[in-house]
């Protein structure tokens, strides 16, 4: 879009602004009212799409690496989060495991039942919220900085407010996992294949992108220079 949109920015800017605002609003409000983990993550992805589009709408070269970094950081955390969801199952009374425990209430006390899964999920949620020392923080900072540089200060302010609002449902789940009594019908299952390994890699990668983002940012900058 950076290459194709150059020269017609003013014509497509109103449409992009509308899409950005609508996606952030729908993702934020939808996520807040959810009581299902998978649906919460789905609405979260809508809000994050709005954040990414701020960088896309900036129409300058610095935004390219910011958007690429954001997508990599978000993708890493998303893969890990859905991996955790797949390993938290629901047990019916008097029966065996009946499926994934996607209801938020089923995640109460997960930190006591399986510290690894709960800890990894907390890392991914903190990254989604843009908390420092995670890849999500660096990604949001870079994209929002690119937006300000591109003259999109109003959108960035709205995005910061939306990001603060989305943090509510991320921290809600973290508090449920670590500060509430365990749910009797939620059962963390043993890793199937390399699921636990993948979750661990995603968690470590999410932290590394937040602590030492320089190597990836340098690589993306060189790749951008090569392509342009």
Language model segments and positions:
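Alpha-helical transmembrane segments of multi-pass membrane proteins predominantly involved
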Residues: 1-228
């Amino acid at each position: 879009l950076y290459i194709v949109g150059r020269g017609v920015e003013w014509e497509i800017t109103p449409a992009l602004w509308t899409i950005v605002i609508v996606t952030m609003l729908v993702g934020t409000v939808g996520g807040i009212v959810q009581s299902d983990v998978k649906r919460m993550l789905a609405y979260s992805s809508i809000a994050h799409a709005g954040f990414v589009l701020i960088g896309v709408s900036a129409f300058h070269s610095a935004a390219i690496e910011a958007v690429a970094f954001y997508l990599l950081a978000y993708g890493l955390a998303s893969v890990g989060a859905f991996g955790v969801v797949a390993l938290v199952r629901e047990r019916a009374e008097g029966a065996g495991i009946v499926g994934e425990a996607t209801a938020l209430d089923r995640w109460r006390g997960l930190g006591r039942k399986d510290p690894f899964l709960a800890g990894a999920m907390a890392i991914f949620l903190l990254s989604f919220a843009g908390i420092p020392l995670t890849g999500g923080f660096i990604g949001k900072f870079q994209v929002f900085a690119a937006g300000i540089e591109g003259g999109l200060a109003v959108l960035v302010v709205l995005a910061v407010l939306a990001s603060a609002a989305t943090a509510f449902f991320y921290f809600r789940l973290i508090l449920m996992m670590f500060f509430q009594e365990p749910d009797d019908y939620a059962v963390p299952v043993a890793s199937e294949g390399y699921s636990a390994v993948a979750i661990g890699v995603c968690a470590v990668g999410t932290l590394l992108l937040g602590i030492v983002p320089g190597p990836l940012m340098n690589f993306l900058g060189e790749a951008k220079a090569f392509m342009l």
